[in-house]
């Protein structure tokens, strides 16, 4: 798709991609059109001057925000997965609560580092795995006496409930600070609306 819109990036390593999103994660990502821009943007990522903020829906009621500083490496047996482990690469995430529901929480996460599956691994590590993410413990949880629609929506949510919401960086040529925000996708908004309806029906 990138090559269709910007054919010249075939000459840039990794088709200009500066950082990746996990499969099925929606939202913003950085792509450079030249090698020079890619090099500069990678440097910004490594120096942690790029601001990347995500939103997710997790299983469980998160009591407060916080910081997760837990190293991440490749899982010893299941090589497609990552895990918190001694000897892994440093990984730091900052999270805060946006909204609480009966059995779930809408959370915002700011990345300080950018390890593979970082948010998914870190939130599971503190026992709040993402909705729709069975690879990291996100088996669906049903609020007591929830509606059939609520149950089916949680059970069949087709992906991890994770969205790259906000991105801020310095333009690689001009140095101007730039930012972008991506609206939440329809499936995410729909699930939030169901969770709100469920909370209001039982708590008011």
What is the predicted role of each segment?
Residues 58, 94-97, 130:
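Conserved hydrophobic positions within beta-strands
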Residues 2, 30, 56, 95, ...:
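Residue-level signal for inorganic ion chemistry
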Residues 41, 115-123:
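Short beta-strand segments enriched for Tyr within beta-sheet-rich domains
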Residues 20-21, 61, 98-100, 133:
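Residue-level recognition of beta-strand microenvironments
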Residues 102-109:
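Short histidine-centered loop motifs in beta-beta connectors
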Residues 59, 109-112:
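A structural micro-motif recognizing beta-strand termini
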Residues 1-81, 92, 181-197, 202-204:
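RNA pseudouridine synthases
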Residues 89, 112, 122-204:
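Pseudouridine synthases involved in rRNA/tRNA modification
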């Amino acid at each position: 798709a990138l090559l269709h819109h910007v054919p010249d990036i075939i000459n840039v390593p990794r088709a200009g991609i500066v950082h990746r999103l996990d499969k099925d994660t929606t939202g913003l990502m950085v792509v450079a059109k030249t090698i020079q821009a890619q090099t500069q943007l990678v440097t910004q990522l490594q120096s942690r001057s790029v601001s990347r903020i995500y939103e997710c829906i997790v299983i469980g009621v998160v009591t407060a925000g916080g910081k997760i500083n837990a190293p991440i490496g490749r899982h010893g047996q299941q090589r497609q997965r990552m895990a918190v482990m001694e000897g892994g690469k440093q990984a730091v995430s900052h999270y805060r609560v946006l909204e609480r529901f009966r059995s779930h929480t809408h959370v915002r996460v700011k990345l300080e580092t950018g390890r593979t599956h970082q948010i998914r691994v870190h939130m599971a590590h503190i026992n709040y795995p993402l909705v729709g993410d069975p690879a990291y413990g996100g088996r669906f949880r049903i609020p007591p006496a929830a509606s059939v629609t609520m149950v089916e929506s949680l059970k069949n949510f087709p992906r991890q409930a994770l969205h790259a919401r906000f991105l801020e960086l310095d333009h690689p040529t001009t140095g101007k600070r730039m930012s972008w925000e991506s609206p939440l996708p329809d499936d995410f908004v729909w699930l939030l609306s169901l969770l709100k309806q469920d909370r209001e029906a039982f708590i008011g």
